[in-house]
Amino acid sequence: VTELVSRGLLRVVEFADLHLKESNTIHSFDSLANADEYTYNGATGSCKQYYQDQSNGKYTPHFDVIGPVVLPQTQAFYGTDAVGVSGDDQYIADFVIDACKGAQQLGVDFANYDQDNDGNVDLVYILYAGHGQADGGASTCIWPHAWDMQSALYFGNTKQTEFFVKTNSMGQIISQNLPVLDGKTILRYACSNELVYRSNARTSIGTICHEFGHVLGLADLYRTDGTDSKEVPGSWALMSNGNYLNNGNTPPNLSVWEKYFLGWVEPDMLVKNGAINLPADGKTYKMLNRTSIVPNEGALSTDTIYYFENRQKSGWDTYLPGWGMLVWRVVYDADEWYYNTPNNTTTRFMLVTANGSTPYTNNLSGGKRQDVPFPGSWEVTEYQPYSHTSLTNIAEEDGIITFLFTNTASSIDNPTIDNMFNQVFDIKLDGSKLKIKGTSHNVNGNYSAKTDVLREL
């Protein structure tokens, strides 16, 4: 297994009128981000440990923690809600620009933070003094989020005129001037707060891991349009509100699809009749609604696909609401993931519940926590994703899930699967020769969820 190590900047910033707590030193934030063993306030590990574990050692982020950078403006200047919209920080573009310029003044060379040589700074993360609006902070607090400077400048979240994005009536960019430091463009970024909830306790890793998930290409699984939905995964998923489990100290493991999307696991296809063993932290499975085998397009397939995994209350999953077999239903849409709206207009990423309820009612406390997984408290022993497939005799013993898989479609009794797992191709015409070059997964910046997958030539 080849380990990919990414290097990014974590800028710790203070406002003109608000400073870090004296006990929250740069060293303490470096430990939170990078320590091999991080247990402060009951933490299960550091941000680095979390992503090492999610990738089974294939990916290790390292953060150069810089600061504190003292920003020229007050917290309220950057963070006050624009036109009364909660979470829409009025001058967030200026916040990012000032944080990056301040880091440069401390000696940071941004040319060292473009590992994929695409001209953009990688892994821009800002941790700001005080509270965040998302977990009880005032409307003048910045809402922890991930975004990009093109959008922030286009929507006018700035008070200066040096940097801008202009579009025509069709919404196409006709001119822009993005911040460039040491020859590298500041484009995508993420940020979160120093203090958790309304207390004065130092932040935990949960929200940082959530926002860093956006940097890697993951989308929010709650509804980002501000409306309520009881079909979102809730505390069962880091990218919903699982980042708050154990006061943010123990975010849950990523779902099997998210690991698949990032190139860290490859689920087996459920196609052939027989008994299936599903151990925790072991094999995972997926199922397509097809009666014949076609090339597998990987996590970017636009089919409705079901994913099956065994999740037990240990390690990063210690504080999950329950345990057993989780069934995820995913309908991938590149545009919806790119714009961070997979569950807004319709539910494209959902957790199927054993008793037919909604995961939202089984969240952080109360509710019937074992209603979600199979077999669960309702002892649900059967599930039929499609008319021609069924899972029967679902059982759990000693943390291992077993079931009998039946597929009545005769054309796939003995399938052969041509796996094109998550592959993206660069196609170039060189004279009379067509050159096709495959690239790897998006954690190294080679492609994003917006990229098309080659289907046929």
Question: What would you call each of these model-derived segments?
Answer:
Residues 416-457:
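C-terminal outer-membrane/trafficking sorting elements
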Residues 110-123, 297-300:
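Acidic, glycine-anchored loop motifs typical of Ca2+
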Residues 1-32, 82:
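Fold-level signature of zinc-dependent metallopeptidase catalytic domains
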Residues 11-16, 127-131, 218-219, 241-244, ...:
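Active-site-proximal beta-strand/loop segments in catalytic clefts of secreted hydrolases
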Residues 231-268:
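Post-HExxH zinc-binding segment in Zn-dependent metallohydrolases
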Residues 1-4, 405-421:
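Low-complexity, Pro/Thr/Ser/Gly/Ala-rich linker/spacer regions in secreted
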Residues 21-61, 65, 69, 136-198, ...:
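Non-catalytic C-terminal accessory/binding modules of secreted extracellular proteins
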Residues 126, 206-221, 308:
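Active-site recognition of the HExxH zinc-binding catalytic motif
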